Structure formats: structure tokens, C-alpha cells
Regions:
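BTB/POZ (also called T1 in voltage-gated K+ channels) oligomerization domain detector
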Residues: 1-133, 308-413
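Active-site/pore-lining binding-face segments in mid-to-C-terminal subdomains
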Residues: 241-336
Length: 413
């Protein structure tokens, strides 16, 4: 296992661990980290299958002659009281085992805390975000790991720095979304999106929906389909992010009762909920719980968004809306899933709108199109939250069938 932080560099050999370590299941090899097993460290942590030996003082929120409770720093690092640590951390044979983060995450944090100017990995950490040629998935994950753990440890200044680096990387979102993203990383992104900075939170959720967007024919790639099912099937995702769970729910719902995914990947209880949603979620423009009147009535003065444009660009904004979001149609179909299968294309039309308003030929200098786009992003987030609430209501209903559900849908369980 590499102890390095950049996959472009060949990893050095890992240091062996003394043979007095306790037996581990499945013959898991325990190794010392080749960089952050410090000879004079005071505490040994086992994270994944890697031992780190560090001074706990590096985990304090701010450096200085303060009397910190290092146990509280460890509790913050663990992050979840429901996942107790084991071991005392006094030796390799009795390490303090932490299961709520990965060795990769901790290694990235230590790079930020212990790196030195001149070290190539540390210099890359300081500069990669500023160079779009280096905007890779590995670099994105590095800043994400640092930001999440800094948040956890209350290192607010460093968390803000990681936040700004990610903002720079999101300028290359189009190339990043082409990569395969695992569920753990997607949930990490959603976790970091729980920030008071609404604009940054919206950017991260836009990015997540772009990762989980079907092709123009409405089909998800096999990896993305498995990812959606994994996210939908995890109660932890709902706890962390209603927006992410709601979007995963919509995508899984769009597959329909005849899909192999429903019949082979989902439990009976999940299928009951989806059947009920399939029957109930028709004529979405009139489906009050979803709250998308702004989408289908953009010129409506109360809920529509086109009124945000000025007299110079109002006609251009309206035309741009019609050729992007307008392609969703009226969303008034009574056929099960017709409207749902239109709505899953929302991220694609959002990107088309964003590209159009960034044109240098835009008729006004007030950036009205950008104001509309920010409102669109906030409304889509709210829609995804509403989808989570709709799902929760269906779960509460006996048998997963809401009193508002239609009839005539084949409930083949």
C-alpha cells in the first residue's frame, strides 16, 4: 500500500511491522506508514491496515501554548460516538484503532499539517488547484479529504482553505465528472457540502448531480446505476444529505417496475415504496409536494425566475430558458413515470443554460443570467429535499402505498 499522496509517483516500500501484533481477520497485513510513522511519536493509530505514529498535539485546532484535552481531539477525529475506538495507542501491538476514516484521508491531512516548503508533494498541494492542467480526480479527492477532516477537527482556517481549492477545481467539473466515483467519495462530497456557504454548497450538489446524470436517452452507465442503488439503499446517505438521497431516489424510481434493478437489487420493502411513488408521482407540474411550479411556469411573476432579468436581457433569458429547461415540457402526463423520466434530465439542461449565459455576447452587464442560475440551483436543491420528504411519507404509510397513489399499476412483488 502506498504511503504517498500522489499516484503519479512510484510508492516506496512499506516498513514491516513487528510480529507481536494481534491476529487480524482474513490475514489482513498491518503495515507502518512509510512517511507518518514518526520515531518519537507519542500515540500509535491504526487506520485501515496502516499504523501511524504521531504526536496528538498536531490534531489541536490551533497551534500555541494552550492546555488542550488531547482525548477530545481524538473524539473529534473519530467523529461518530457510535463507532468506538479500540486499543490504547501505546504500541504496535495495542494501537488505537479508528474505523471512521481511511488511511488515505489521514495521510492527506498529515501532509497539510506536517508538509514542508520544497517537498514536492507539499508544493503540489499548494499549487495544483491553480493549474487547470492538474485538475484531476486524485487532486480533487486530496483537497476533499483535507477539508472534511479539518471540519471534523474544528480547524476552520484550514477547512476554508480546502474549500477554496475545491472551488477552483470545480471550474474543471466537465472533465472530472467523466471519472468513476465511488459511493464513499460521493458521500464525502455531500458531507462537505453541509456548509453555511450556500453558493459553495450549491456548487457541490450541482457537481454530484452531474456525476449522476443519465445520457440523453435516459440511461445510466452501469457503474453509475450501481452507485445510485448503493446511495438509495443507504440510510446514512439520507442522514447526511437529503439532496443527494432525493436525487438517487428519483433516478432509481425512473427505472420503472420492469427494470432488472428493481427486481434483483432492491428489497421487497423498497419496491413497495417505489411502486407507490410510481403511481403517485404523475402530472408533476401539479404535484404540490415536489414544488416545481417555478420550472414549468418561468414567466409567472410570483414563483417564476425570468422576472429576475432586466429589460436589456429579458428576451434573451426567455429564449435561453425555452431552449434548455423548456425542453422538459409541461410535465402534465398522467402516465406513470413519463414526467419522472423527463425530470432526470434537469442537470443536463442546467448545464446548457449555464453555458448559454456565459456567452461574451450577453446583452447586459448585470449578469442577470447568473442570478437566475443561482436561483435555479437553489430550487433544484429544494426539489431534491422535497423528494426525500416524499420518500419519507411513503415509508410511513403502511405497505408503502400512499392514500394518494393511483390504481392499475402492476404491484408484482
Amino acid at each position: 500500500m502506498s504511503a504517498q499522496v500522489d499516484v503519479k509517483v512510484a510508492p516506496p516500500p512499506n516498513n514491516p511491522v513487528p510480529s507481536d501484533l494481534p491476529a487480524t481477520p482474513a490475514a489482513r497485513a498491518i503495515i507502518r506508514d512509510s512517511t507518518y510513522y514518526l520515531d518519537d511519536g507519542s500515540t500509535i493509530l491504526l487506520i485501515g491496515n496502516t499504523l501511524f505514529k504521531i504526536h496528538l498535539s498536531i490534531l489541536v485546532p490551533s497551534i500555541g501554548p494552550n492546555n488542550y484535552d488531547y482525548d477530545s481531539c481524538l473524539r473529534l477525529l473519530i467523529g461518530n460516538p457510535g463507532f468506538p475506538s479500540t486499543g490504547k495507542g501505546a504500541s504496535d501491538a495495542d494501537p488505537l484503532a479508528i474505523s471512521t476514516l481511511s488511511a488515505r484521508q489521514f495521510r492527506h491531512l498529515l501532509l497539510a499539517l506536517l508538509g514542508r516548503p520544497g517537498d514536492p508533494f507539499y508544493m503540489a498541494l499548494l499549487t495544483d488547484a491553480k493549474d487547470r492542467c492538474r485538475h484531476t480526480q486524485e487532486v480533487f479527492i486530496r483537497y476533499l479529504d483535507i477539508g472534511n477532516l479539518d471540519d471534523r477537527l474544528h480547524m476552520w482556517n484550514l477547512a476554508d482553505w480546502a474549500h477554496h481549492q475545491l472551488e477552483l477545481l470545480l471550474k474543471s467539473a466537465s472533465q472530472l465528472i467523466e471519472k468513476s466515483w465511488d459511493a464513499e467519495t460521493v458521500v464525502q462530497i455531500a458531507t462537505f457540502g453541509k456548509t453555511p456557504d450556500e453558493e459553495f454548497s450549491n456548487q457541490l450538489h450541482v457537481f454530484l448531480r452531474r456525476i449522476l446524470t443519465p445520457n440523453p436517452c435516459g440511461n445510466l452507465a452501469p457503474h453509475d446505476l450501481s452507485l445510485c442503488v448503493s446511495l438509495y439503499g443507504s440510510l446514512g446517505v439520507l442522514t447526511i444529505s437529503q439532496e443527494l438521497f432525493g436525487w438517487a431516489f428519483l433516478l432509481v424510481l425512473s427505472l420503472g417496475h420492469r427494470s432488472a434493478t428493481w427486481s434483483t437489487k432492491l428489497a421487497r420493502e423498497d419496491r413497495l415504496i417505489l411502486y407507490a411513488a410510481q403511481a403517485e408521482m404523475v402530472k408533476l407540474s401539479e404535484y404540490t409536494p415536489l414544488g416545481i411550479s417555478w420550472l414549468v411556469q418561468p414567466r409567472q411573476p410570483t414563483n417564476g425566475l425570468l422576472h429576475l432579468s432586466c429589460s436589456l436581457c429579458s428576451a434573451r433569458c426567455a429564449d435561453t430558458w425555452d431552449t434548455t429547461f423548456g425542453k422538459l415540457g409541461t410535465l402534465q402526463s398522467a402516465m406513470p413515470l413519463d414526467d419522472v423520466r423527463q425530470l432526470i434530465h434537469l442537470p443536463r439542461y442546467r448545464q446548457m443554460f449555464a453555458k448559454a449565459i456565459s456567452s461574451t455576447s450577453w446583452p447586459c452587464k448585470e449578469k442577470c443570467g447568473e442570478a437566475i442560475l443561482q436561483s435555479v440551483d437553489a430550487r433544484i436543491n429544494k426539489m431534491c429535499q422535497s423528494l426525500s420528504e416524499i420518500h419519507a411519507d411513503l415509508v410511513k404509510t403502511p405497505g408503502g402505498v400512499s392514500e394518494n397513489a393511483g390504481v392499475g399499476i402492476p404491484y408484482v412483488i
